[in-house]
From Swiss-Prot:
Keywords: Isomerase, Magnesium, Metal-binding, Phosphoprotein. Activated by phosphorylation. It catalyses: alpha-D-glucosamine 1-phosphate = D-glucosamine 6-phosphate. The keyword Ion transport does not apply. GO terms for biological process: carbohydrate metabolic process; peptidoglycan biosynthetic process; UDP-N-acetylglucosamine biosynthetic process. It comes from Campylobacter jejuni (strain RM1221). Catalyzes the conversion of glucosamine-6-phosphate to glucosamine-1-phosphate. This is Phosphoglucosamine mutase. The active site is at S99.
Length: 445
């Protein structure tokens, strides 16, 4: 049985992800990290879901039972956990979040001592420990060796300083009116503070978390309300974050929601013009064909990888690169962060606007994405795609019609993601109906 998906362990809180699983998983991870322990401290943060308290207590119980000390820092963005794990010299960091998912889901993500997400090999080792009853039992310590847990509430300042240091020293946000949608999530304190301290006029939306409203009709997955507010308030730009603030969606001054690949393209060019872009840009296999065309036109190479910001980071390391991301809004500036950081991306786009003295719409309009259709189809089972009868023929037929395809299963849900891309939207709509019917029969039979 696999516990880890594309981004940690995730599922419905209280059902799949209950206190027993969380405690045992924490013990398994702690056993793994003990071999490389330097400080015997593990950092634990969370987003604003009500179930986070249950899972946090279970994780603390699991870690202290095998002798680890735990530092609890409360609601903080996922990239803050990555940064603070290394900054506070902890052996590992744990983030309790289901990112953009609804409140009833939750998840557990791990970071190593350097703030990096774990490789699949390490995740498999932790899973092996999880299912090894003898090892779990043998790792429990005597009473006098049980670890301690302490809560620290003032570490937010360290993260804010690191975020502000990513913004050019010769610029100020004083001329910008910015609307922030913080999704009732982990950035509800951090994001407004950063933008205000850098001088922006800030209007904040969805900043009253109650444990049940995270991502609900707000944030990066639902930018419609932000778009309306940007227009109504005549703001220069709007930024929407998801529940754990590792992704960003930009809304221009006209209330138009920017395509994630357009954002990647213009930020890559901005880095190149400053002489800061190293090696090729990395995007995922879901990236729009127009991104590659735009980058190549400006002498920038594009490499692709599997979906997931940890795969983007792995490819960047392999290539010696420092910039990449996903169409969904995970954008990695590896000079400043070890994972996707919505706040850093928002500040870099603000710096681009200010340095060019141009509007958000004119900057983003440089990349004109090809039409894409993406459907998340609920399915009964996940069959091996290579063994589905007729799929090769279907893909060949679409290819002959100049339609690019990508079919992949969700790593966390019973869904298949169906992506079609072409220059003709009517053709896409027609062919998508056929594709949906094909997979309904193949995977719900």
């Amino acid at each position: 049985m696999r516990l880890f998906g594309t981004d940690g362990v995730r599922g419905k809180a209280g059902e799949f992800l209950d206190s027993f699983l969380a405690m045992r998983l924490a013990m398994a991870a702690g056993i793994y990290f003990k071999d490389k322990s330097i400080t015997n401290n593990i950092l634990v943060g969370k987003d604003t879901r009500r179930s986070g308290y249950m899972i946090e207590n279970a994780i603390v119980s699991g870690l202290t039972s095998i002798g680890y000390n735990v530092i609890q820092i409360g609601p903080m963005p996922t990239p803050a956990i990555a940064f603070l794990t290394e900054d506070m010299r902890c052996d590992a960091g744990i983030m309790i979040s289901a990112s953009h998912n609804p409140y009833y889901d939750n998840g557990i993500k791990f970071f190593d001592a350097h703030g990096n997400k774990l490789s699949e090999d390490i995740e498999k080792k932790i899973e092996e420990i999880y299912f090894d009853d003898k090892l779990i039992q043998a790792s429990k310590v005597d009473m006098e060796k049980i670890g301690q847990a302490k809560r620290i509430d003032d570490v937010i300042g360290r993260y804010i300083v690191s975020i502000k240091n990513s913004f050019p020293k010769d610029l100020t946000l004083k001329s910008l009116r910015v609307v922030l949608d913080v999704a009732h999530g982990a950035a509800y304190k951090v994001a407004p503070t950063v933008f205000k301290e850098l001088g922006a006029e800030v209007i904040v939306m969805s900043d009253k978390p109650n444990g049940l409203n995270i991502n609900e009709n707000c944030g990066a997955l639902h930018p419609v309300n932000l778009a309306a507010e940007v227009k109504r308030l005549r703001a220069d730009v709007g930024f929407a974050f998801d529940g754990d603030a590792d992704r960003l969606v930009v809304v221009d001054e006209k209330g138009e929601v920017a395509n994630g690949d357009s954002l990647l393209g213009v930020l890559a060019l901005y880095l190149k013009e400053q002489g800061k872009l190293q090696s090729s840009v990395v995007a995922t296999i879901m990236s729009n064909g127009a991104l590659k065309e735009f980058l190549n036109k400006h002498g920038i190479e594009l490499d692709t990888c599997n979906v997931g910001d940890k795969y983007v980071l792995e490819k960047l390391k392999a290539n010696g690169g420092n910039f990449g991301g996903e169409q969904s809004g995970h954008i990695i500036f590896s000079d400043y962060a070890k994972t996707g950081d919505g706040l850093i991306a928002a500040l870099q786009f603000s710096a681009l606007m200010l340095s060019k003295k141009k509007s958000a719409s004119s900057i983003l309009g440089q990349v004109k994405p090809y039409p894409q259709l993406l459907i998340n189809l609920k399915i009964a089972e996940k069959k091996d795609l290579d063994k589905i009868k007729g799929l090769k023929e279907l893909k060949k037929d679409l290819e002959n019609k100049n339609i690019n395809t990508l079919f992949r299963y969700s790593g966390t849900e019973n869904l298949i993601r169906l992506l079609l891309e072409a220059r003709d939207i009517k053709l896409l709509e027609k062919e998508m109906k056929n594709v949906v019917e094909f997979f309904k029969k193949a995977l719900n039979g």
